[in-house]
Amino acid sequence: MTAPVLIESLDQEGRGVAHAEGKVIFIEGALPGEVVTYNAYRRKPSFELAQVGQILKPAFSRVTPECHHFGICGGCSMQHMDVRTQVAAKQRVLEDNLKHIGKVAPELVLPAVYGSPWGYRYRARLSVRYVAKKGGVLVGFHEKRSSFIADMQACRIMPPRISALIMPLRKLVESLSIRERLPQIEVSLGEDVDVLVLRILEPLTAQDETLLKAFADQHHVQLFLQTGGPQTAYPFYPEDAPELSYTLPEFDVTIPFHPTEFTQVNPMVNRILVRRALNLLDPRRGERIADLFCGLGNFTLPVARRGAQVVGYEGSAALVSRARQNSQRNGLAGSTRFMEANLFEIDESWMREQGDFDKMLIDPPREGAVAVVTALEEKQLKPWRIVYVSCNPATLARDASVLVHRNGYALKAAGVINMFPHTAHVESIALFEKARRQA
């Protein structure tokens, strides 16, 4: 057993940080202010990675995890701390990245956006494996630091009706002839239908099909089958199920989607995120606004509903087609355009060809949008306002540095969106502005 150490802070993965014998110790399951022992599982000359041992002095922010799989399952890493402490830690991660990577600081720290900490996950990719030693099939997330699948009976971060399906799914897969050739089940929930996408590597037998249909009827789900990449997923049973979609009621927008297309995992927080983004962007009638990495139109359509003319750019031809369909579905085709573009390779000449935009919204994947912000260098004073939605604080900070130090913008505000409670994932939003040309 190690000597007790004092936990000084949390790192970006939510691990407690301590110092001992000239090394930095990163301790999973430890909280700032606690005195703990630890069990190292990786030792390097300057640091160690460890699991918490005994908690000799607990922090006031420590709570009892509600899921008995916590600590083994890799789906969550922060259930041992109260939600406000989780969010405060994420806010520090955001501000530290902006300071140390971007050399910037927001003029205003926005209040954090919260949602329900339980039952929030409407999208999940569950691994499946037949394990003879376990006596059957496992369905769930991977164990921490492991390729093994956690032996899960339930999942508190998924809606109760889906959590309750884990054991029936295990029994279902075990009964199939292809139980060793079904590696993944993707969960995709809409407002009127719950979809499970089964990744299959061999054809089903007639008996398999009968078992799957009986499961779908009993548990009121629609089953898709996926034989290759995401684009190969197709409805298996029932084929006449309701359309998979989500709504943004504040903007009278309904967005249909395919179960393998990207949507936010947390629909309630997504509604709040869209509201905040539009409040910061403040679209006005007559303005021309760009929505980069627009996807299905999650932001594009609400912005258009406010009266602006919006051009959405997306790298996937399939998503561009879907976004156009969604704009027509919502009666917004006249105020929106959607264009395919590889936004990781654009430059200043491409940006000039698009014409002037009054404002811009950027919602990139984890890689960020460095090509976009670099291409804005020659745009003079337009767009004068940019709202940047980020799922990676490091790339946000890098891009913020370009916008502020090279392009003349000010970082007016930034804050976290707690899209993934109980995980270290940091979703955030930032507002950039530059002085407008005077008439």
UniProtKB/Swiss-Prot annotation:
GO terms for biological process: rRNA base methylation. Keywords: 4Fe-4S, Iron, Iron-sulfur, Metal-binding, Methyltransferase, rRNA processing, S-adenosyl-L-methionine, Transferase. GO terms for molecular function: 4 iron, 4 sulfur cluster binding; iron ion binding; RNA binding; rRNA (uridine-C5-)-methyltransferase activity. Its EC number is 2.1.1.190. It comes from the Bacteria. S-adenosyl-L-methionine binds at Q264, F293, N298, E314, N342, D363. It is an enzyme of class 2 (transferase). InterPro entries: 23S_rRNA_MeTrfase_RlmD (IPR001566), MeTrfase_TrmA_AS (IPR030390), MeTrfase_TrmA_CS (IPR030391), NA-bd_OB-fold (IPR012340), SAM-dependent_MTases_sf (IPR029063), TRAM_dom (IPR002792), U5_MeTrfase_fam (IPR010280). Disulfide bonds: none annotated. Pfam families: TRAM (PF01938), tRNA_U5-meth_tr (PF05958). Signal peptide: none annotated. CDD domains: AdoMet_MTases. The keyword Iron-sulfur applies. [4Fe-4S] cluster binds at C67, C73, C76, C155. The active site is at C391. Residues 1-54 form the TRAM domain. It catalyses: uridine(1939) in 23S rRNA + S-adenosyl-L-methionine = 5-methyluridine(1939) in 23S rRNA + S-adenosyl-L-homocysteine + H(+). PANTHER family: 23S RRNA (URACIL(1939)-C(5))-METHYLTRANSFERASE RLMD, RNA M5U METHYLTRANSFERASE. Catalyzes the formation of 5-methyl-uridine at position 1939 (m5U1939) in 23S rRNA. Belongs to the class I-like SAM-binding methyltransferase superfamily. RNA M5U methyltransferase family. RlmD subfamily. This is 23S rRNA (uracil(1939)-C(5))-methyltransferase RlmD. It comes from Nitrosospira multiformis (strain ATCC 25196 / NCIMB 11849 / C 71). The gene is rlmD.
